[in-house]
Amino acid sequence: MVHQLSLVSMVSHSNYVQTISTLQALTGLLTPQPISTYTLVTKPHDVFKPKFEPGKVNQIEQFYMRCVTTWNDETGNKFDLASPVLENDTDILVNRLFLGVDDRRNWTMQISDIPIAGKNQACSAQTIYESTLVHHHTKVMDKEKVQSDVSNESNMDIDDKDEDKKENIKKEESGEEVKGSGEEVKGSGEEVKGSGEEAKKSGEEAKEHSEGNASQTVKELVVLNRRDSFLQFLEDLGYDVINQFWMKGVRFFHGDIVIEIFKVFVRDDEKDAEKDKIRLKLLDPSNTFQIRTYINVPKSTDVELINQGTKDLLKLQEFLKNLIKLEIPDRMFMDSRVTYK
């Protein structure tokens, strides 16, 4: 948990080189730290509506959660911020993340409270709760034992044996009748008797064959491959993905102040892309850079550090006033609480 103090601004693409040069001279960093992130915006799928009672404060609320990881494919590494992104001339294709190619990936899950309200606020102040986990994409082998249906075969064998028995009985009866009728059909009686013995042997062979089939149970192994995806983890956690975006920019450090200049990209579904690729477009087609300056304070109750951080941000605001205008963002747009109507 951190208490974050922040100011935001924007700068046109034509002033990007001038802004970078000024910040390099201010911070002394000739090579700023690159920013290349991919963010999932999630929402709880279980609706929670607390019962409001007079005289009681309901502090249990649901929040949207952001899941942030690195954007480190070939497109993200070779992207040039100094070149403008033209709508029809620039193709930005990124790799799909959840294909199971990466074995390991770090995710930072963030939930932020609404900024503090007040007329005399010099900067935006809000509490951010975050946790970082390491997720491994693994292949899980699910083996299901499927037992073959032997009952149908055994029933058929039993029916065959019954038919053999009936035939034997009929043949024996016919043999007795032939024997009692006279000597003229004695030869035919012997033939019937011989056929009865052959039928008896075939019946015993069928019986042994059916017993062998009953004793041997055929088992088949059906192997199903599934990937232990991060999306499945979010589903088990109780969250659904509702949006996603990509960020590309640079980061400067001035004392305890972090200065970020970046562009935001979203998915472009209007144009077709390859099967394993996602086409991106700028969230702001005017190629405007977003600027965010912030200081993280360990505790929201540390008044001394909060006052010192506010003074540092105001000094930076005064120093850069002729280049960029740092201001307080609208707190209502930073409210991440889930409201159900």
Swiss-Prot record:
Record's GO cellular component terms: core mediator complex; mediator complex
InterPro entries referenced in this protein's UniProt entry, alphabetically: Mediator_Med18 (IPR019095)
Sequence ranges of Basic and acidic residues compositional bias: 163-211
UniProt keyword annotations, A-Z: Activator, Nucleus, Transcription, Transcription regulation
Single Gene Ontology BP annotation: regulation of transcription by RNA polymerase II
A Pfam family: Med18
GO molecular function: transcription coregulator activity
Source taxon at top rank: Eukaryota
Compartments in which it is found: Nucleus
Signal peptide span: none
Region (Disordered): 139-216
PANTHER family on file: MEDIATOR OF RNA POLYMERASE II TRANSCRIPTION SUBUNIT 18 (PTHR13321:SF2), MEDIATOR OF RNA POLYMERASE II TRANSCRIPTION, SUBUNIT 18 (PTHR13321)
Family of the protein in this entry: Belongs to the Mediator complex subunit 18 family.
Assembly: Component of the Mediator complex.
Role of this protein: Component of the Mediator complex, a coactivator involved in the regulated transcription of nearly all RNA polymerase II-dependent genes. Mediator functions as a bridge to convey information from gene-specific regulatory proteins to the basal RNA polymerase II transcription machinery. Mediator is recruited to promoters by direct interactions with regulatory proteins and serves as a scaffold for the assembly of a functional preinitiation complex with RNA polymerase II and the general transcription factors.
Designated name of the protein: Mediator of RNA polymerase II transcription subunit 18
Source organism of the structure: Debaryomyces hansenii (strain ATCC 36239 / CBS 767 / BCRC 21394 / JCM 1990 / NBRC 0083 / IGC 2968) (Yeast)
